[in-house]
Amino acid sequence: MNFEFEREIGFINSQPSLAECLTSFPAVLETFQTSSIKESTLIPPPPPLEQTFPSLQLGASTLQRPGSQKQAGDGPALRSPPPLPVAPPAPEFPWMKEKKSTKKPSQSAASPSPAASSVRASEVGSPSDGPGLPECGGSGSRRLRTAYTNTQLLELEKEFHFNKYLCRPRRVEIAALLDLTERQVKVWFQNRRMKHKRQTQHREPPEGEPGGPSAQDDAGEPAEEPTVSPGDVATHRLREACFHPAEAAQGPRGAPPSALPATTLESVGASSPGCTMLRAGGRQSEPLPEDACPERQDSPFLPDLNFFAADSCLQMSGGLSPSLQGSLDSPVPFSEEELDFFTSTLCAIDLQFP
């Protein structure tokens, strides 16, 4: 018993193979063999089961019958589709035939377009025939252009001159007056606006643009005035000589005294006494050589000259004519006589206050 129990325990724990189990238990082997034999004999019985259950046979027969019917019906079904596509296309797709029918007349209408254009050209003069022609053009192909009469074009141009964009009530009114459709009036105004835009872009801007040739010429003239006319330079030098004689005497920084122009020498000579010789009439003043009137920054007369130069300018501006007063403030160039008179008066005023 213990041995058998141990073997059972070992069988449970070690899990031997099926062969060992069958050899160790002969009774089990016999039962296994008999059961396997019985099962082998029972494998073919499915047909007997169908015999025992007649409902299964009925289901199988019903399943087989529709299949046979389907197989039998597939033949005519496959044969029947060829006639089906022949009949349905006409009612199912009528729009395809309509498009073809419309395309054919459009091509035929496009061919006699020269004749239609000649007819329109002959009938342009009559305003009564105008509305009929656009209708023909609208009903035909789109390539045909609307032929407007002279009166229609005149009225449309007048309206475009006052209003480049039409509201719908006005458009309807014009269309009724000119015997045109509202769409024709709208399209004409659209085309006219585009034409006006092209004209304004390609013609007017080159003349008025800042980069245009005329604008460059206009801009170049004032730029050349300060360089060509010495009047502005002379007035600037004279003002500097009136208020800052020492700086005017030195001239621009780094420039040698010999490089100063005659106008600066005259203005500098006007601020210092004894540098110019007045002629009898007081019309001209000749500057002396540079060695004859040396300018020194450490001269004790410079502060007095500064003070009296400002006063002399004020007195001179009060005694001058109104034209000269205006010319001092304006960029208009002075004439040579005015400049000479101006320098001589400055020198005369400076000589009064040694």
Swiss-Prot record:
Renumbered to this chain, the Pro residues biased-composition regions fall at: 79-92
Q: Where in the cell is it found?
A: Nucleus
Q: Please indicate which superkingdom the organism of origin belongs to.
A: Eukaryota
Q: Where is this motif: Antp-type hexapeptide?
A: 92-97
**Matching InterPro entries, A to Z?**
HD (IPR001356), HD_metazoa (IPR020479), Homeobox_Antennapedia_CS (IPR001827), Homeobox_CS (IPR017970), Homeodomain-like_sf (IPR009057)
According to the UniProt record, where is the region Disordered? 39-143, 193-231, 246-295
Q: Which GO terms describe its cellular component?
A: nucleoplasm
GO terms (BP aspect): anterior/posterior pattern specification; dorsal/ventral pattern formation; embryonic skeletal system morphogenesis; facial nerve structural organization; morphogenesis of an epithelial sheet; neural nucleus development; rhombomere 3 development; rhombomere 4 development
Q: State the DNA-binding region(s).
A: 141-200
> In the record, what terms sit under GO molecular function?
DNA-binding transcription activator activity, RNA polymerase II-specific; sequence-specific double-stranded DNA binding
Point out residues bearing the modification Phosphoserine. Answer: 272
Q: Which UniProt keywords apply?
A: Developmental protein, DNA-binding, Homeobox, Nucleus, Phosphoprotein, Transcription, Transcription regulation
The annotated regions of Polar residues compositional bias extend over: 52-71, 264-274
Subunit details for this protein?
Answer: Part of the nuclear protein complex gamma-globin promoter and enhancer binding factor (gamma-PE) composed at least by SATB1 and HOXB2. Interaction with IFI211/p205.
Family the UniProt entry places it in: Belongs to the Antp homeobox family. Proboscipedia subfamily.
Q: What is this protein called?
A: Homeobox protein Hox-B2
Q: What is the originating organism of this protein?
A: Mus musculus
Lineage of the organism:
Eukaryota, Metazoa, Chordata, Craniata, Vertebrata
Q: State which gene encodes it.
A: Hoxb2
